[in-house]
Amino acid sequence: MDQQTPPRARTTGVLLHPTALPGSQVCGSFGEPSRRWLHQLASSGIGVWQLLPLAPPDPTGSPYSSPSCFAINPWFLDAADLSSEGYISAEAMAALPGADAPVDGVGPLDFDLATQRSDALADALVAHWPEQDNSRKDAFNHWCANQAWLTDHVHFMVLHHQHHGPWWTWPAALASHQSKALQDWAAEQGDALLREKLLQWHLDRQWQAIHDLAKELGIQLFGDVPFYVSSDS
């Protein structure tokens, strides 16, 4: 007797990258813009939110060629949530580049301004980190210890910023990932390494909160991954 495959439930989805979500900052974020969007999907009976890769984009803004297949694009970090949680001050948030340039979800995204904003936000996170309580620092350290990709990514990002070019133009010992050279270099970096780690920790925290809300509302997140990791990675 032939067995028939039971019919699958049908649903509707929408493809919208978080960069296009309207909100109070230069680029759509994992804060209120994403929460509002998920509630709109749920109230409209739409069951799937499809996204492009969340990885850092290449210099053209494409997320399909990224320097990392694990890291998240810092543009998505929501400053308002960080301020309300006490990770940065209200004054620091108001001073961020683009504070007077909310995104409407219609016009083009200013890549340079989004990067300037995320850089300034990272600096504010480092500046306010010493005043955070031990429970937050313990959570951060625990997260870092469980991310096998994090150290290499952080080293790469800081070196890339310092040398203003692809890895094959760096000093040979660092470009070839020689352990002693990297250890000696890393020992002198201090806040520069902390800065990149804090960015990724907060991005992961905010993304997990969006993931949890989507599950609560019955919305499936249908993601994508970079086609390939950039040669400059």
Regions inferred by a protein language model and the residue ranges of each:
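Acidic/aromatic-lined carbohydrate-recognition and catalytic surfaces
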Residues: D2-S233
